[in-house]
Amino acid sequence: MAERANLVFHNKVIDGTAIKRLISRLIDHFGMAYTSHILDQVKTLGFQQATATSISLGIDDLLTIPSKGWLVQDAEQQSLILEKHHHYGNVHAVEKLRQSIEIWYATSEYLRQEMNPNFRMTDPFNPVHMMSFSGARGNASQVHQLVGMRGLMSDPQGQMIDLPIQSNLREGLSLTEYIISCYGARKGVVDTAVRTSDAGYLTRRLVEVVQHIVVRRTDCGTIRGISVSPRNKNRMMSERIFIQTLIGRVLADDIYIGSRCVAFRNQDLGIGLVNRFITFGTQSISIRTPFTCRSTSWICRFCYGRSPTHGDLVELGEAVGIIAGQSIGEPGTQLTLRTFHTGGVFTGGTAEHVRAPYNGKIKFNEDLVHPTRTRHGHPAFLCYIDLSVIIESEDIIHSVTIPPKSFLLVQNDQYVESEQVIAEIREGTYTFRFKERVRKYIYSDSEGEMHWSTDVYHAPEFTYSNVHLVPKTSHLWILSGGSCGASLILFSIHKDQDQMNIPFLSVKRKSICSLSVNNDQVSQKFFSSDFSDKKKSGIPDYSELNGIVGTSHYNLIYSAIFHENSDLLAKRRRNRFLIPFESIQEQEQEKEFMPHSGISIAIPINGIFRKNTIFSFFDDPRYRRKSSGILKYGTIEADSIIQKEDMIEYRGVHKFKKNYKMKVDRFFFIPEEVHILPESSVIMVQNYSIIRVDTRITLNIRSQVGGLIRVERKKKRIELKIFSGDIHFPDKTDKISRHSGILIPPGRGKPNSRESKKVKNWIYVQRITPTKKKFFVLVRPVATYEIADSINLATLFPQDLFREKNNIQLRVVNYILYGNGKPTRGISDTSIQLVRTCLVLNWDQDNKNSSLEEARAFFVAVSTKGLIRDFIRIGLVKSHISYIRKRNNPPDSGLISADHMNPFYSISPKAGIQQSLSQNNGTIRMFLNRNKESQFLLILSSSNCFRMGPFDHVKYHNVINQSIKKNPLITIKNASGPLGTTIQISNFYSFFPLLTYNKMSVIKYLQLDNLKQILKVINSYLIDENGRICNRDPYSNVVLNPFKLNWYFLHQNYHHNYCEEMSTLISLGQFFCENVCIAKKGPHLKSGQALIVQMDSVVIRSAKPYLATPGAKVHGHYGEILYEGDTLVTFIYEKSRSGDITQGLPKVEQVLEVRSIDSISMNLEKRIKGWNKYITGILGIPWGFLVGAELTIVQSRLSLVNKIQKVYRSQGVQIHNRHIEIIVRQITSKVLVSEEGMSNVFLPGELIGLLRAERTGRALEEAISYRAILLGITRASLNTQSFISEASFQETARVLAKAALRGRIDWLKGLKENVVLGGGIPAGTGFNKGLVHCSRQHTNILLEKKTKNFCLFEEDMRDILFYHREFFDSSISKFERSFLGFNDS
């Protein structure tokens, strides 16, 4: 009784963890027998109390957490803000998805943590609480779904469903939540069935690998160990894991604290000793593990350590391999059952945050960080090395170290409040997460035209397609507008920016705008209008060519151009772009008439022509053939010239064709029908047979002409030709027939006819020899082409009115596009152009102007009597200016800079258009389509544009409309002029050019002195293609600049010929995001593009921005029309797989089967080469490789152990490291024999044990080359020393056949092979104590060797080799002898 009085009475609730700890202490103090007696009493007590309590469970016991309401409300608020950011184009869809998941995941986790304290305070004896937290039934996550919130669910692929279930099962689910819940729960049910079988198979493979590992010796005598220290370079190891790692291990080295030895080598560690190490703060402790054991196919007691069952050193004969395999496999079977209850609820992970401890100012070194975006799209700083951040408050200075690759979310010198998040530690910094690459497709919400605000380049695997890569973060814009496709004729009189009545605008996908019967009169009216009467007709006159008076040294080439190509500069990112001429109609000379699609002008993208470049080309329809054939030049050969300038690239790649310059005035075309068929096609005609027209050649092809059939079989295809013509069998006397392939002019007789008929046309004679003896002649018809006289330039381009000196000449050159005797092949339903007429630009080289080596092309918009016309002007420039292509980014704009302003954007003022703009009216914007047959028009109706203004700080003369002032955002309706603006030019007495400078030459001032007449503009102005506006009002000295929405006053003493350009505030074509404010008190803009800039207001075409980050793939070309639902962008991002054990088990399997998880970095090979070079340089050849191989193996072993442990720990499963180490040791202990050397012992490519390879090398006293290799558990099972064990696992026939051929011997060392053959197993009682004998003497020698301060780099190399030999001879030889003796007996 006296003893009991000293006992301390603890009145405390203990949970499962505390009971575990109590039992382990009891075993340490009292041993197994007494402990089991105590535990029996505890069990009886527990059952008594449980029976007395009799817990009941009712629905009222499920108490919802009170803080849930405002937590969910807060998460919804954050989601709403996120949605707005996405709408404004600040974050893209992937960032939005990520952040949304993290918001809801954090809310759900917080609710789960609140649950336990809530129960403990309000109702500690709540049956739900008692059951789940005692571990009797259910766990925290299941109870959380009952009383917290069900949260985010995974779909069957393990992907997240981003709509969270906010209710819990107690409150009940809404219909949507119920469907999502069933979706996830089904995944749980299916997974359970599949994973159970997977887990069983995993256990079988694991046991297979390690079944032969038995404890067969007390000490293998190794001098190696693995050091464990509580403080690592990167992080602190938690005390719990540190204790778990050390308990039950055996020390590999003596441990000193100061000069005192506290523990000696080969001593096993108990809890007392480990606690003493922690107290004294020992730096590193070297322990023995299965990795360090020197035994080849079993393990020694010291390297294994204590047995987990009874807490003493493991007994000899214990089958530790099978225990290890089952310890790892068994939790897999258990854990699969857990998923059933949680029902596919998503369990992910969020990043850790560093918070400020109190209010203060942040200070850090800005040179060590650089700006970036977080994965949620927030601005942040990324630090590459450890960054010290100092928080200064009034009286304290606190320093925080932020690890590398973390995000700093605050700026330098920023004031932070207490608990504010200042940094985010990246999730993947310390933890091992299985990531997968996922593609996310973003689809267009609306129909419209695609623009982008930065240069993009082609994705490497899609060089010639419409997939582009985004190099830096930028916006993609979809400009609104309905598309309408039609033939060229219907809209040929409408130009860009015209207004027209849209009779029928189909919004359906890719439909063609069709005019109904009722609207025929409307279209008729367009065409029959009298073009001379410009006032009445709503259509401006485009059919005549107007001359232009030139007042400078430029030469003007006169032609109106199609305006739909006005944004070609932005679209074509190739060498040059095309502008087709408008149709040129000459009434008198019908010969000269050319279709307007025929002539194309090729202008380089920088607008600069070199000498002798092709300026324009024309494909004459007379030289066009539908059929295939052969081209012959007749007698005179032509020079082959290749001019790379002749090829125009258009949406794809073209190989440069050879062009043949003509010296002949005629050439011949011999037609033939050619079919190229696949190998497998059935041909229904014979070679050298004669067929009629419309004969069936194959199942679905009929011949177009009749004649002789030739069938040639080539690689993977059959070429079938049909030659039309007459067949003649010549006499021996005919000489001509011997020459095959000649042309015979008209007037000559046929070579073999007895009657001398005259040949009317040219013919082509071809000799055909079906067999050696037999031949005949085929006479084929020939089409003759004469090269016509060159086109008269005067008809194409009117003469210069001022009769100036002509610097620039145009030469007409004809090119034949195919060589002599070359076959021409047409693709189906296309015609072949044989001759191309080109205009070549040339000019005289003056001595004075020797620097004028280039011509520059300009676009000019000139207006006469209310009509605006577009011209190309080609002028000579000095070459040194031409390469300066500078963009003027205004410093003070504060808005989007004018980088992506369209250089060829022009707004055409037309006096004649006075239609009222009703709902069904629209403005045409043409754009280039790949299909040349039809044009697509983009029609902007009034719903696509809105008007901003007037702006208060702008001074203007005439107030346009009082009603506009009251409501700044007005949809444009029923105002006159294009898009509701009255544009009218009066006082245009005579007609003169408006000189403009192209953007490429940077000129600071706009010259206005050429304007002899006063240009008076009422509320409107002229705009050229650069978006510049010239406005001279003599009364006010005001120059309106389009780039600023304000006026610029000229001083009286200012030189009157120049007005200065000012920086831009709003420029044409500029993009705005939503809610940007331009003027100080002006309204907030909607997102869009500035279409019309007026004195006091701006018209904006609505547009939707999409954010694209680097590496995103854009589908489509610049300026292309996209329809609703088209794929716009593909984002590729890394995503952590959810940490459910349903995904966890495959992770373990993935590691054990050594499948690669992450993509390997490209420069890994370079690093390995570098490492090999340096280490061999330091240590010399043999030792360098040895150390390198050893380090590789050790490092990969430790890494594999940590990865597997991490997966199990994340599920709350504790597995001792030594079980995993035994498995990992087996999959890393094989090496692959290389080609060089060792040929007399092992075959190249053979897998042998690492220790065996080392010993063989020492025995042979020669270098042995092998590579360390990681084998998966399946391959390791099929590469053991026992072929019986391998055959009983998989591929029985193959393994046995191979073993028989090689004459393998099975020594029956493992358990499995003995079971198969019905013998006793060499483990437990069947383990023969006399099997291994190690004398005391040898052990002493080893210990003496160890006490010498042995270091690899201090002793002589010879000593080390000697030591190795002696060590192995002493420890191995006797054991080998005894083992062989045992087997013989």
Curated annotation (Swiss-Prot):
Main location as per UniProt: plastid
Question: Cofactor note, please?
Answer: Binds 1 Zn(2+) ion per subunit.
Name of the molecule in the record: DNA-directed RNA polymerase subunit beta''
Q: Where in the cell is it found?
A: Plastid, Chloroplast
Keyword annotations: Chloroplast, DNA-directed RNA polymerase, Metal-binding, Nucleotidyltransferase, Plastid, Transcription, Transferase, Zinc
Q: What Gene Ontology cellular-component terms does the record carry? A: chloroplast; DNA-directed RNA polymerase complex; mitochondrion
- Enzyme Commission number(s): 2.7.7.6
Q: Which InterPro entries does the UniProt entry name for this protein?
A: DNA-dir_RpoC2_beta_pp, RNA_pol_beta''_euk, RNA_pol_Rpb1_3_sf, RNA_pol_Rpb1_4, RNA_pol_Rpb1_5, Rpb1_funnel_sf
Q: Which cofactor does it need?
A: Zn(2+)
